[in-house]
Design a protein with these regions (language model features):
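Amphipathic repeat-derived elements
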Residues: 37-61, 98-105, 156-185
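Substrate-binding clefts and catalytic carboxylate motifs of secreted carbohydrate-active enzymes
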Residues: 83, 90, 121, 128-267
Length: 267
């Protein structure tokens, strides 16, 4: 199965924990069974990520029911290591300007109402469900507990470090930014060239072609990959070369070397 291939590959890569991200899905039972089999710990997010949520009674009731169902379903797996309330919701509210934007453009009262819903879900409902149905497993209300650029992010709780990529810092930054627990970091690459060929024609062999751009979901994606390749690998990426297609396969392959370099350094 795809799960078997993925999780056995994680073990072969010497990984010991898998995070089920709050912007995804609660996984199928077979996923947790295979994590048990392979000895992989599971960091399990509840399915909340990168957004504020309603606080009306019907929504809060549905949150409670969904949490109870999944906690009861997953709790018996020895691979389960942690329940986490959400991905980046608190960090975004406090540090990405969300709260201040609401206060400035609407009102303090509306901001308070929005955060009251946050408090209800992540500090009351979910901890109560864990306390009642899975007291043996720890609960962490939000990941990360701080934000990139804030000193406390490296000394308290877990961290998501995106100075590399979003901040375009060199990979060597990772040698200095060492938090207590790094729960998220990353960098993009293009897929294997054999995969790229399945959705392109030779006339599309330009990372800024319409086809390549339509497969790039990050606003800074292709330009950031290109900047790091020129910085770290001195790949010649003039528009003339790209239009001719001469360098396109090497361009794609070089982006994968960047990922290799980052993972080797970070892990």
């Amino acid at each position: 199965s795809d799960y078997e291939k993925l999780l056995s590959a994680a073990v072969d890569a010497n990984m010991n924990m898998i995070r089920v991200w709050g912007g995804g899905i609660y996984e199928e039972d077979i996923f947790y069974e295979l994590c048990d089999k392979y000895g992989l710990l599971v960091w399990q997010d509840f399915m909340f990520a990168c957004a504020m949520y309603p606080g009306n009674d019907s929504f809060l009731k549905s949150v409670e029911q969904e949490a109870i169902y999944n906690v009861k379903r997953i709790r018996t797996h020895p691979s389960l290591a942690l329940w986490c309330g959400n991905n980046e919701v608190l960090s975004a509210w406090e540090n990405w300007g969300w709260k201040n934007d609401i206060i400035e453009n609407q009102s303090q009262e509306i901001a308070d109402t929005i955060f009251k819903a946050y408090d209800q879900i992540f500090h009351k409902i979910l901890p109560k469900v864990i306390q009642e149905y899975d007291i043996a497993t720890d609960y962490w209300s939000s990941s990360p507990s701080s934000s990139t650029g804030i000193p406390e992010s490296l000394t308290s709780g877990d961290a998501h470090y995106w100075g590399v990529w979003w901040g375009k810092e060199p990979f060597s930054t990772y040698e200095d930014k060492i938090p207590r627990f790094m729960s998220e970091f990353g960098f993009q690459s293009f897929p294997e060239f054999s995969s790229v060929k399945k959705y392109t024609n030779p006339s599309d062999y330009d990372i800024y072609s319409d086809v390549m751009k339509s497969h790039q979901r990050s606003s800074i994606g292709n330009s950031t990959i290109e900047e790091y390749m020129q910085r770290d690998y001195n790949v010649p990426l003039t528009k003339k070369h790209i239009e001719l297609g001469d360098n396109f396969p090497n361009h794609v392959i070089s982006s994968r070397f960047i990922i290799l370099k980052e993972l080797q350094l970070m892990i």
